[in-house]
Amino acid sequence: MGDFAAPAAAANGSSICINSSLNSSLGGAGIGVNNTPNSTPAAPSSNHPAAGGCGGSGGPGGGSAAVPKHSTVVERLRQRIEGCRRHHVNCENRYQQAQVEQLELERRDTVSLYQRTLEQRAKKSGAGTGKQQHPSKPQQDAEAASAEQRNHTLIMLQETVKRKLEGARSPLNGDQQNGACDGNFSPTSKRIRKDISAGMEAINNLPSNMPLPSASPLHQLDLKPSLPLQNSGTHTPGLLEDLSKNGRLPEIKLPVNGCSDLEDSFTILQSKDLKQEPLDDPTCIDTSETSLSNQNKLFSDINLNDQEWQELIDELANTVPEDDIQDLFNEDFEEKKEPEFSQPATETPLSQESASVKSDPSHSPFAHVSMGSPQARPSSSGPPFSTVSTATSLPSVASTPAAPNPASSPANCAVQSPQTPNQAHTPGQAPPRPGNGYLLNPAAVTVAGSASGPVAVPSSDMSPAEQLKQMAAQQQQRAKLMQQKQQQQQQQQQQQQQQQQQQQQQQQQQHSNQTSNWSPLGPPSSPYGAAFTAEKPNSPMMYPQAFNNQNPIVPPMANNLQKTTMNNYLPQNHMNMINQQPNNLGTNSLNKQHNILTYGNTKPLTHFNADLSQRMTPPVANPNKNPLMPYIQQQQQQQQQQQQQQQQQQPPPPQLQAPRAHLSEDQKRLLLMKQKGVMNQPMAYAALPSHGQEQHPVGLPRTTGPMQSSVPPGSGGMVSGASPAGPGFLGSQPQAAIMKQMLIDQRAQLIEQQKQQFLREQRQQQQQQQQQILAEQQLQQSHLPRQHLQPQRNPYPVQQVNQFQGSPQDIAAVRSQAALQSMRTSRLMAQNAGMMGIGPSQNPGTMATAAAQSEMGLAPYSTTPTSQPGMYNMSTGMTQMLQHPNQSGMSITHNQAQGPRQPASGQGVGMVSGFGQSMLVNSAITQQHPQMKGPVGQALPRPQAPPRLQSLMGTVQQGAQSWQQRSLQGMPGRTSGELGPFNNGASYPLQAGQPRLTKQHFPQGLSQSVVDANTGTVRTLNPAAMGRQMMPSLPGQQGTSQARPMVMSGLSQGVPGMPAFSQPPAQQQIPSGSFAPSSQSQAYERNAPQDVSYNYSGDGAGGSFPGLPDGADLVDSIIKGGPGDEWMQELDELFGNP
């Protein structure tokens, strides 16, 4: 069983989910289905208990006393699921039939009401006596003047009842009362009452009838069994709708209850049953087969009390909010329900426990769901389900999703209820509903024995649902009182929190996670979370009160609850749980005093609260823990939260950050602070993390690609991505000065970061190039010329070096532009010139995109590691190395990194290790030629390149602005003289200021590498250079240049922006000089072959790159259909690139 316990639990859990979904879709689901007369309900009922039992007991329990085999369990589950499906289909059919019947009955009722109304009006107008109509209506006789209004009101009520029955269908009405989850129970309990209401005399006996297994719960289900089922089929939306409708539902329920089920006893039960019998709404229609006469009786009864009904309905519809109506009906129904139902005796402890659990769950249940999402779900999936079976499982499921889905009323209600008594009441139903779920979950979890015991005992089909409803009603009332008290306490606490907001905000955020972590324990330990809640605000700095803090946290976190709850589900919670719990345990107990002494008392440290108030407050709260711990833990937590939030929100936050990149760093910080509560706190410290950003932004911004644009600002980048590491530090310090200092530091760091990023990016690019080279070699080994052309593309990647040129913001903007332009130009060039064709040959689509991305700084590396190395093999591998080595002045260092990455390329390896240029030549040549060969390309395509490519992309995109233009300008040059564009002279001029001077050496080698990479293509690329020296020396010198450090010069040219850097960006900008054998060789002023070989790969790379100075010829040759075009065509043909 141990082996199968988990599968059984999982399978059962899945079946539970399926069953719960099916059952919920089946109308009230669990209990309703179980209550259904069909034998299939028995299967679902056993299904849920079995599922719960199996899940709870770890397998043997439930449907299968013993799980001998996983297949057996699965088969049983399948059978049960099939049975549920069949039952669902049957219910749907019955529902449709019943719906038609109901429509007919409703029409009849409407017609009869209308006729009666006309008759009454005629009598009133003629005789002015409404008494004659219903001699049994003394009140109406006395109220002949108001009979018209009464009739009209009755018509209105019946219409509303019809609409609501049609729209919400009574089964959901009851569900709504107990909560979204209660749909499982409420339909059942409704059906129970409906059954009882079948003989409405029994309604007086409802307490005794409640235990009825709802043998007739489907008596209405028979008419409308599928109504709840179908509605539960749409159970979640139905519940939501019903929740929205619940306000009306009481009204509906009143007339509905009065419509049929209460017909006989309606006069007797009017006040009670009206409130109690929202459950009976379905019976209206069900019994309404004889509804005309019954409705006449009902209406006579209603007419008897017509004034009261009018008042009630008018008040309900007009004066009383739907929430209040729900509360009234729920409370009254619950009150009567509790006394009426003798079984609540067992439920009463549960309701109390559940009330306590619920009261905390109202605060903590959300915490259960949020932090306890693992816990709450296990609890929901555990014995609670087994005991409560479907009823519990569904509420727990509904309540559990409520946490992930803040929109779900239970969670929101639970969360909000502590916040606002009205919401607490309005949710009052919903929180009790989740309360039921929590009763089931927390009660089942914490009170598992009592919850499962009493619940299991009442678990008789209807009784458990009704009991749950009763418990829900009691709990709702209690929860409302608790929530009101808690809310009052929370209000006080909130005031205290407002005072302590800065501390509490962080505390709450952390504790929201922590309490979410602890909350599952909290509810049982502190049934009344409110009491502790009061204490929490008293000493918000007292983190030990994680549970208490959560309640206040919930209202303050109301806005953040979704995020926090979502974050609770996110890995952050784990980190936050880890960080926060230990912080709460150790730092709270130890740091409470210290915190109070440290920063809790020194709120002035949070003098930046104006902007950082939220941020600073959490830092202050963190200081409550420890001056350092808050920073470290906050940074960790905030980083985690920010990273998670960013990861969660990355699509929007990067967008936000993209524009932020254009914003001033301070504005970015403010925006980030404002936009992100959690982020804001770390943002408070954002200035300090700038260093961390420098380090992390390389990784973090990479992860959040667009983040890089904001990262270069440092503050923005930090806030967005890297800030999580350091953001916490600024909190207590004057952020204005710190921010300035941080900006300065960040700027200085940004350079370092860029270097680091380039190193990382180069590594990533090398990995990507290697990976791509491997893939491309495999694809292109049959297409050597394409490989050559692909290397030509590598000059595109060379532009990636430009990433460093522009400001991160500019680069970010340039990235998109350069990416688009590079994609367009690169694709045009790919079509026009073999360059792009080369990229496609390696990764036809990738190179086309890579050309575009090469400007972006990513695709060129990732997409065409081989061609990119070929073009500027360094651009992918060497460019990274060159860029970074240029920054660090060590091309070999990165080349060595690439060397191991490109070790597969024997030449490239030696070259790489020997020289970054060798790397480029190797990657370019080996990637190009070996890519043809496959081993080198394989070595080059290593996955390391892509990460750097990505990271480089961010940076390249930054540099893309300058090289954007030249890449755009040079892109056509690239395609024709692709190396020219890759010189990125335009972009590298921007980078020229950046530490890329060493790249000056590389550009020549890069041009060579381009030639090498494009042995044939380089000739076309650098027809002159190739014609000159590279053509002959390309193959031979490729090996030599590959083995030579010359490749570094090739890299410099390969990253023409690098020579553009060192020397004339204009020349680099020039497509012909793009590879700067001319421009860079001007810098190095060597013959293309000489420069290449002299510069590190003078022969192989230099030869080809000398062609780059001849980029015009190369462009002409390529444009004129040189081998580049042919390669492009072949690549396009191979890869189907347009």
From Swiss-Prot:
Residues 37-68, 119-148, 169-188, 207-237, 334-480, 503-547, 615-662, 691-721, 968-991, 1024-1084, 1090-1109 are annotated as: Disordered. Residues 395-411, 467-480, 633-649 have a biased composition (Low complexity). Disulfide bonds: none annotated. The modification N6-acetyllysine is found at K603. GO terms for biological process: Notch signaling pathway; positive regulation of transcription by RNA polymerase II; positive regulation of transcription of Notch receptor target. Residues 37-48, 130-139, 173-188, 343-359, 372-394, 414-426, 1064-1084 have a biased composition (Polar residues). GO terms for molecular function: transcription coactivator activity. Keywords: Acetylation, Activator, Notch signaling pathway, Nucleus, Transcription, Transcription regulation. GO terms for cellular component: nuclear speck; nucleoplasm; nucleus. Its main location: nucleus. InterPro entries: MAML1-3, MAML1_3_TAD1, MAML1_3_TAD2, MAML_N_sf, Mastermind-like_N. Belongs to the mastermind family. Interacts through its N-terminal region with the ankyrin repeat region of the Notch proteins NOTCH1, NOTCH2, NOTCH3 and NOTCH4. Forms a DNA-binding complex with Notch proteins and RBPSUH/RBP-J kappa. This is Mastermind-like protein 3.
